[in-house]
């Protein structure tokens, strides 16, 4: 907060009175911010596209080198083709860079000088001012507008100032995508395991050991799953995938480090006992008369399970999925080891083929809360962001659970009159 003392263009004051400064600011600020948004788009999207094409050409040349050697005709032809394309891309990059410099130079002309509470003057670029309002002259509607605008920024913008300002859109996106992938991974395996234990396995010491192991797995600390995911998924499975399919990128890892896929599988493994237990209970609740009626009509055991048992048990299976989502979406400790980062330069889901990038690191609301609360340079100043992000995480988990509960209710209504 501060008192405006002058608005400068090219280091010349064009307004010195508060009313005049406010009027000129409202005239100039939208234009300046539009140039700032154009600059950010050029720097993040257009420049990123050129860099991806340059990297793809480098990897293509590396693959040809590994396959044919540097003295081969194939390598010479590929090198000539890629060199011509590289020059064209560098020209395109220079044009983008020139436009960015032009926008920076234009925005640098506009500055606002404010006097802080300590009486010291402070100069701000208009492009760096996200919003400005006369705090002591706002009526109820204006205050509501500022409040709603802050929420819009919080939900749709990217973080600024070491995550202590701005929005959490990348963290929302990462949390939702990771939770959905975790659910897609854990539900089929959990249902298959429960079907085998309940419908096919014969009672004995081996099945007893499996049930004990499943129950004990539910009590393992989450950080242990994170260590397992790092060692098995990242360093073993991921490194093997890199050796087989991404040799040209080595020694830089592709799947041999933390990423969205390994984080989802680690949390799927952690929530697997929840789905198994819930599915077993749902299968046990299916009336015996329905099974016997189906078998008496000539159906096989698998046909009975597929047509009678599973549809009737589906609401209970959905309950297990809801519990798994609720637990997995809020976990932080495993994600610190297998993919969550403080700031992700790219989203795991975007418009670039193949659209879903399973190897990328991602931001997560739970890790974002931890980072603000314990890793921020000024934890006290970050407390409002911590509380707001916590509320958002609770609401996000509740929203995903409500959607799953709605699906469960629809399935329950569909099959509630299907008794023999």
Predicted regions, residues:
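Membrane-topology segments of multi-pass transport proteins
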Residues: 1-164, 419-420
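Membrane-interfacial helix termini and adjacent extracytoplasmic/periplasmic loops
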Residues: 148-166, 201, 206, 225-269, ...
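Alpha-helical membrane-interface segments at transmembrane helix boundaries
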Residues: 156, 160, 165-177, 181, ...
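Interhelical loop and adjacent transmembrane-helix boundary motif
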Residues: 162, 338-392
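Transmembrane-helix boundary motif in ABC transporter permease subunits
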Residues: 182-214, 227-228, 235, 404-413
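Hydrophobic transmembrane alpha-helices
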Residues: 213-220, 233, 261-275, 279, ...
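Transmembrane alpha-helices
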Residues: 276-287, 301-339
